[in-house]
Structures are given as C-alpha cells and as structure tokens.
Amino acid sequence: MHKILCDLLTTSGLNTLLFYNPYAKLCFTSTITSYFRKTTYLDFDTTYTAYTKSDLIKNYVLNDISLFTPNEGELESLITKIVSNISNSSLLIIDSLNSFYNLYYKKIDMESLKGISTIQHTLSNFLMILLKFCQSLKIPILVTNMMRYRKKKEWIKTPTNKRFLQNKSTVMLFVELQSQNIFFLDIITHPTLLPTTLTLDNNNINIR
C-alpha cells in the first residue's frame, strides 16, 4: 500500500482531492503525509491543525510537518516564508480551496456575490505560482476541495474553481468514509493508473 499511495501523486500538475466529508479528507491527508519525508501544510480550514494540537493524529511529528494557518490579510506576507519552506519539503498540501475564500470574505458582497471573480483570480494566480515552483523542484502539490451544490436547472455537485482545476489537475481523487476505521479513495483521473477504488485503513487518527 505504501508504494501505491506514493505513486498516486505526480509532479507534472495539481493533485486534487475532492470530498464531501471533512473527516474523510482528514483521514487521507494524515495518511499521505506519513509517507513523505517532510510536508509543508497550508491549513486554511484549520481542521488538521486542531487535530494535531489535540494529539489526535498518531503519525504527526512536529519536525516533519510545517503548518501554516494564515488569517485574513496574512497570506501575502507569508508567501516568501512558505516558498522557502517548500524548498526543504517533499510534499505541499493546500487544505482547502474552499476555505481560501474566508481570507478575503470582507471583499465579497454576500448578497450580489460581487468580488467572487476577483478572489477566484487571486486563487488561480496563487496556485500557479506554487505549482510552477513545485514543478521546478519536482515536489508534488496536493489541493483539497469540498464538493458543493449549485442550482442551475437542477442541483449539481461542483468543486470550487471547477474550470481551473479541470485544466490544471493531472490527478483527480475522491475520498469518502466507509466507516470510522475505513475510507475509500476513488482514482478518477491519473496519467498512469486506471480508474479504480482503493480501500484504506484509518490508522492515523485517534477518536476520543
């Protein structure tokens, strides 16, 4: 299983993990980090950080994972530090794209949604900068994205920045919880692996 999980991520484009259940996503990210020497983790939704502070993630080693949890208005000032940290890492995780918008919520008119397109453009530029940097170092970059519902003619499931992710994601995965101790990982698109479903044990998180 170690080799399969390591082979899942590519350095040729984004690796996108889709999810409905935040706990299922946490199961996967806590598992995948255990197979990499050092991880830079941008924790926008702070779930992973909360679990580590509560000692609920078994494989968490302080020196192996560099956590960044930027607040509103802090991201731009942290870019240099983040990029410097990535240089010494073997994996970059951005978790999650949905929570990226919380950093700019004051710039969004919640009634008209004016300002959304500007933030989407900012997010796309942010991802492209990190993607190109990671590609130059041959470091995989994993982004997580919660599926949401949008009503057009009918309700459909769609990820944040759907068009950008479709164009830039070389690997597309979907994780779902089967039980407290087991989760499924669907390989949707991959440059070398056929679509399939992996069954993984959740051995990295303590539930209290």
Predicted regions and their residues:
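Conserved catalytic network of the ASCE P-loop NTPase/AAA+ motor domain
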Residues: L9-T10, S34-Y35, N59-Y60, S84-S87, ...
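Conserved nucleotide-binding/hydrolysis micro-motifs of P-loop NTPases
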Residues: D45-Y48, N71-L75, N98-F100, M147-R150, ...
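Conserved RecA-like P-loop NTPase ATPase core
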Residues: I65, L130, S169
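P-loop NTPase motor core
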Residues: S84-F164
